[in-house]
Amino acid sequence: MNIICFGDSNTYGYDPRGYFGGRYDADSRWVDILAAETGWTVYNMGQNGREIPSAAPAFPDDTDLLIVMLGTNDLLQGCSPTQAAERLARFLSGVYLDRSKVLLIAPPPMTLGEWVASHRLIDDSHTFAKCCQVLAGQLGIRFANAGRWDISLAYDGVHFTEQGHRAFATGLLEELR
C-alpha cells in the first residue's frame, strides 16, 4: 500500500527540545512507526509551520490512503476554528482521490505551554476537532480524532513528545485495522 501523510511539524517529526529544533529519530516518529509496523510504503509530507494550503497538490493516482492532519498552525496564527475548517474544506475539495482513500485526522488539542498561553487556543482546538468531524461527514471521507489517543505534548503545548508519537501511531493503527 502507498500511504501519503500530509501535515505540519507533528507529521514531519519536529523535535522541540533543541534550540534549533530538529527531528526525532525515525523510530520515534509516528509516520515511520506506521511504515515499520505495517510494511507499507509511507511518504512523509509533513512540513514545519504548514498552515492549510489554499489548494491541494496533485497526489499520485496510486495513492491507497491520504492521511491529512492540519489546522494547528492556522489556529496559532489567529484563525477561528470555523475559518480553519473553511480552509480545510477548500483544500480537501481539491483532492482528486476516491473519497474512501482520504482520512482526515483532527489534531490533538493543544495544552498550556510556551506557545499556548491562552485557554482560548485550547478551546479552539477542541472546537476545531468537532468542525473536522462535521466536515469529514459532509465530504464523505474517513475521520479520526487524535484527541482520543492520549498524545503527550512537549513544553510548548503543541508538539508531540516521543511518547506522543508512539501513542499517535498506536491510535492510528487501531483506526486503520
Region annotations inferred by a language model:
Residues M1-N48, A56-D62, R166:
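Serine-esterase "nucleophile elbow" of acetyl-processing enzymes
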Residues A56-R177:
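Alpha-helical cap/lid subdomain in secreted, periplasmic
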Residues T11, F20-G21, G49-R50, N73-L76, ...:
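Short histidine/acidic/glycine/proline-rich micro-motifs that form metal-
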